[in-house]
């Protein structure tokens, strides 16, 4: 078959019938185009007859150049129902049906929360599906939160295969995109979180041709570890226009985004779009049976556009997270110093004998919270991971009782905390033996068993009532003020017990977990909950809109931490990002101060054998914590990250790393020399720069000719420079 005849007779050519061009002479006159403006952004819309098309999202006041991308298909919502004729012949989700034929009904604007909300309503005359698209703006930030709701107004069930949370259009020229677009995304993995890379679209599989691509650049996650492979955010930078679009998918389960192109005239693509959303049928087995009268809501997604590049996008998202995501909590601005006994310390084997000297050392260093990590509930001869679930103190670890040890924490002026993994029951636990399958995620008639753990199903109110009693007991009996909530397993597809599909069961469970957290914090508003998923395995802003602190990583090599924390600063607020400082018992002052520098521009997660390190190394820890409390932490809740050396690579042991933080009237840069040259040069104009910490190890700094040079006398050193 001739290729051109084949292309002309398939869905590519048919897209014009599904998605007519906005403003085409062939279409009857429709409603007038309109714009929705916030102080920082402009969304523009047009019509193809009575079908609404999203034209573009641009910074307020931005004038598109005459040769900028023109908008073609621009569907405002992409949705596909089972049995419908898909406009796309492949795996793309950029249009869908009835998404392409939705008829615009009306728009409504209202005051909402900290800003304004626009609601756009569509309907489909064939399926009787009604779709509501929500745009929620927040004062002072160039970001809008988007989500979609589908309502079945008909008499028959509808199968939802995908429903976009948001669509972005006109990101680039439909045919020249590979020369002007950079896609920024972050790979994420255990002990190597938040590794940012910039790709041309073709490097991710979205390749230019003279027509519409059948492929897409995409990323996603399947299961309850929302960040197991990638962070749920990305950016598209148009280097020709000097604009960057960005998004953050705010969901603690499966999600997906794609970037590709569509055509509205003939077969030549003229629009580069981004589809953004949560779980769907193709990628996460989340088919939804929408019954008559029922509704289905997508997950929320934050979107925005700025003039500039990656750093400007990070600044916008950082401001948005503070304005719209952080739950009010007294510790948000205090940035308390946390000691945790796990990393390079007791490693899940706590006892009264070991804890008492650690508690003394942590208090002497200046820590304000003291957290006993895993193992406090297991007998000395027990595998603590296979029996979790009862959350009762082990009598042989605490001969005078756990309360005796935690009372010592309080006597020394610290708040006690405990590690929990509340969402699971160990395979050999009493809880798993006693409770029915309805307490657990189930697939194909069997409980989901991962990493010696069964996964509790938070849709079951008996589960949440049980865990409420656990938390109540810990707070009332032990005065626990901090819960490290860990999660060391991924559910993958989810549960098909009492669900339309495994992915829908997981979505309902994910939302029930969030509701449980909200209820918990309403009862205990000063309780700090740390979000941990074997480190950064669930580092998303569904969880971080409820929890106060994010565990950055389980990485044990302190030399790799600067690359992880620098990348993570683009994804998590510095006042929520807890980074380890964990000197070994044999650490010298260089090693101890390197550890401290890594944590001092975010939240200090102190660990290590503070009871055994040398006096000189202990002095570096104590001095670092004192400087943090007296000088640095008051700036962190207003600081914006920047990257004088770009994004680092956790596998590169030669190249130095630098992370900056700017707050009103204050700028600091953390700089780490690894194995490379003794002088690190940064492109910063800072004639009055000085070393804040450590100030007694021979590190020098000089600002001259628009460059800042930091000289390290030895390899593997770090410092904080105030500029």
Please provide the spans of the model-predicted regions.
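N-terminal export signals
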Residues: 5-25
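Polysaccharide-binding surfaces and accessory modules of carbohydrate-active proteins
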Residues: 30-268, 284, 696-701
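Glycine-rich, aromatic-flanked loop segments that form ligand/cofactor-binding clefts
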Residues: 83, 87-88, 94, 98-99, ...
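Aromatic-lined carbohydrate-binding/catalytic grooves of carbohydrate-active enzymes
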Residues: 332-466, 482
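Active-site neighborhood of glycoside hydrolase catalytic domains
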Residues: 442-586, 612
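Carbohydrate-binding surface patches
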Residues: 648-687, 716
């Amino acid at each position: 078959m001739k290729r051109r005849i084949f292309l002309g007779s398939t869905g590519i050519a048919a897209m014009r019938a599904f998605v007519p061009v906005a403003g085409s002479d062939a279409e009857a006159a429709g409603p007038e185009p309109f714009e929705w403006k916030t102080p920082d952004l402009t969304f523009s819309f047009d019509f193809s007859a009575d079908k609404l098309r999203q034209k573009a999202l641009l910074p307020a006041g931005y004038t598109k150049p005459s040769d900028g991308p023109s908008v073609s298909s621009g569907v405002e919502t992409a949705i596909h129902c089972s049995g419908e004729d898909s406009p796309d012949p492949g795996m793309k989700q950029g249009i869908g049906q009835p998404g392409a034929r939705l008829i615009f009904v009306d728009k409504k604007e209202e005051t909402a929360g900290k800003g304004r909300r626009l609601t756009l309503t569509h309907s489909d005359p064939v399926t009787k599906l009604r779709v509501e698209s929500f745009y929620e703006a927040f004062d002072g930030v160039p970001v809008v939160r988007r989500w979609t709701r589908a309502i079945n107004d008909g008499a028959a069930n509808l199968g939802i295969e995908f429903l976009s949370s948001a669509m972005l259009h006109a990101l680039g020229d439909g045919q020249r995109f590979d020369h002007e677009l950079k896609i920024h995304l972050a790979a994420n993995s255990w002990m190597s979180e938040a590794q940012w890379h910039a790709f041309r679209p073709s490097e991710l599989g979205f390749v230019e041709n003279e027509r519409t691509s059948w492929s897409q650049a995409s990323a996603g996650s399947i299961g309850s570890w929302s960040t197991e492979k990638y962070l749920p955010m990305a950016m598209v930078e148009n280097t020709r226009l000097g604009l960057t679009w960005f998004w953050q998918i705010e969901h603690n389960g499966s999600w997906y985004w794609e970037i590709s192109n569509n055509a509205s005239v003939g077969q030549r693509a003229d629009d580069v779009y981004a589809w953004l959303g949560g779980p769907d049928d193709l990628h996460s087995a989340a088919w939804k049976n929408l019954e008559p009268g029922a509704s289905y809501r997508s997950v929320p997604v934050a979107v925005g556009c700025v003039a500039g590049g990656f750093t400007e996008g990070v600044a916008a998202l950082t401001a948005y997270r503070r304005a719209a995501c952080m739950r009010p909590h007294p510790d948000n601005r205090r940035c308390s110093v946390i000691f945790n006994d796990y990393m390079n310390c007791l490693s899940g084997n706590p006892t009264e004998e070991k804890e008492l000297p650690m508690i003394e050392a942590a208090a002497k260093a200046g820590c304000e919270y003291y957290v006993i990590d895993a193992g406090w509930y297991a007998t000395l001869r027990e595998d603590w991971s296979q029996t979790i679930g009862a959350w009762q103190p082990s009598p042989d670890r605490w001969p005078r009782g756990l309360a005796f040890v935690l009372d010592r924490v309080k006597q020394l002026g610290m708040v006690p905390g405990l590690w929990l993994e509340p969402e699971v029951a160990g395979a050999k636990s009493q809880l798993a033996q006693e409770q029915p399958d309805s307490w657990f995620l189930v697939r194909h008639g069997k409980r989901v068993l991962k990493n010696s753990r069964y996964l509790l199903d938070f849709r079951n109110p008996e589960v949440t009532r049980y865990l409420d009693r656990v938390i109540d007991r810990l707070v009332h009996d032990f005065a626990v003020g901090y819960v490290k909530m860990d999660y060391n397993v991924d559910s993958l597809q989810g549960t098909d017990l009492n669900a339309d599909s495994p992915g829908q069961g997981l979505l309902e469970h994910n939302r029930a977990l969030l509701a449980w957290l909200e209820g918990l914090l309403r009862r205990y508003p000063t309780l700090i909950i740390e979000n941990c998923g074997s480190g950064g395995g669930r580092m998303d802003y569904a969880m971080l809109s409820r929890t106060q602190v994010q565990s950055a990583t389980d990485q044990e090599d302190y030399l790799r931490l600067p690359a992880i924390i620098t990348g993570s600063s683009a994804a998590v607020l510095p006042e929520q990002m807890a980074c380890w400082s964990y000197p070994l018992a044999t650490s010298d002052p260089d090693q101890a101060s390197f550890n401290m520098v890594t944590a001092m521009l975010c939240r200090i997660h102190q660990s290590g054998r503070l009871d055994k390190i040398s006096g000189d190394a202990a002095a570096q820890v104590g001095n670092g914590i004192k400087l943090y409390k007296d000088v640095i932490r008051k700036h962190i809740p207003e600081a914006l990250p920047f990257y004088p050396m770009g994004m680092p690579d956790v596998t590169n042991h030669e190249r130095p790393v630098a992370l900056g933080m700017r707050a009103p009237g204050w700028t600091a840069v953390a700089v780490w020399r690894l194995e490379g040259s003794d002088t690190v040069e940064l492109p910063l104009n800072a004639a009055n720069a000085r070393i804040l910490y450590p100030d007694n190890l021979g590190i020098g700094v000089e600002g001259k000719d628009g460059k800042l040079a930091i000289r390290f006398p030895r390899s593997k050193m770090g410092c904080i420079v105030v500029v």
